[in-house]
From Swiss-Prot:
Organism name: Homo sapiens
Subcellular localization, as worded in the UniProt entry: Membrane
Name assigned to this protein: Small integral membrane protein 47
Topology class, membrane: Single-pass membrane protein
TM annotation in the entry: 7-24
CC per GO annotation: membrane
Keyword list, A-Z: Membrane, Transmembrane, Transmembrane helix
Main location: membrane
């Protein structure tokens, strides 16, 4: 796994986690 793949993976995980976080906040 090279640096570019790590950055892409980190960005994808961050986006997914942020989406879940805001979705949960909106539900309350």
């Amino acid at each position: 796994m090279n640096f570019q793949e790590n950055v892409t993976l980190a960005m994808a995980l961050f986006t997914i986690l942020t989406s879940i976080y805001f979705f949960n906040k909106a539900q309350q």
